[in-house]
């Protein structure tokens, strides 16, 4: 097994541990406190993070880690960094709703190499390896049974594009949503893009741990990742994931409205 294959298997193992442990809390009443920005963090988030960090400490003791709850851990000189969101979607998780899961990504020399994104309520998992493609699989299936993903690339008028997003209050995008076919809700918008159910996803104000798996998945599936500044940085205010045929038109509209 190559180092890359070992990392892929470890990323899936981390996702499985997170999904299993989170499921034990799901539908219950885990203790909750609020962070300085007002967002909730529950004992489930912290328990999952603790379990993942323990695995990485044992399996990859020299690797750095970035997590939503604990921030940056490990040595800054490490070439390798794991990026974790133990429970992405804490609000729907606490409400007993769908739309939550685990985000796992690995960076090597500041380049995303491996990504796993899960939605346990759907038994769905999307994953990617740089240079080897993006895939989807059902939780519990062997990786060899995974289905490859490819985002359609045909040109598409913006008014016909199915677009969803994570927008901040008073977002400049709100007044122009009617210029496209806006998707109001989804269990996993990025998963919908990867599987052809939407054509673009707008992420306003997301964090690196929210975005890292999605960015590699979309890239490896043949889509575009655009920070509206000519690159694909994960720490900018805006990040757009899109099918190639709609990416330029959508980015142009967002720049026109001041994004």
UniProtKB/Swiss-Prot annotation:
Question: Could you tell me the keywords of this UniProt record?
Answer: Antibiotic biosynthesis, Streptomycin biosynthesis, Transferase
Report the Gene3D superfamilies cross-referenced here.
3.40.190.80, Fructose-1,6-Bisphosphatase, subunit A, domain 1 (3.30.540.10)
Question: What metabolic or biological pathway is this protein involved in?
Answer: Antibiotic biosynthesis; streptomycin biosynthesis
* UniProt enzyme class: transferase
Q: Which GO terms describe its molecular function?
A: glucose-1-phosphate thymidylyltransferase activity; inositol monophosphate 1-phosphatase activity
- Superkingdom, according to UniProt? Bacteria
EC number(s) recorded for this UniProt protein: 2.7.7.24
Q: Where is the signal peptide?
A: none
Q: Which reaction does it catalyse?
A: dTTP + alpha-D-glucose 1-phosphate + H(+) = dTDP-alpha-D-glucose + diphosphate
Q: Which GO terms describe its biological process?
A: inositol metabolic process; signal transduction; streptomycin biosynthetic process
Q: Name one Pfam family in it.
A: Inositol_P
Entry's InterPro entries?
A: Inositol_monophosphatase-like (IPR000760)
Family membership, please give it.
Answer: Belongs to the inositol monophosphatase superfamily.
Q: What is this protein called?
A: Glucose-1-phosphate thymidylyltransferase
Which species does the entry assign this protein to?
A: Streptomyces griseus
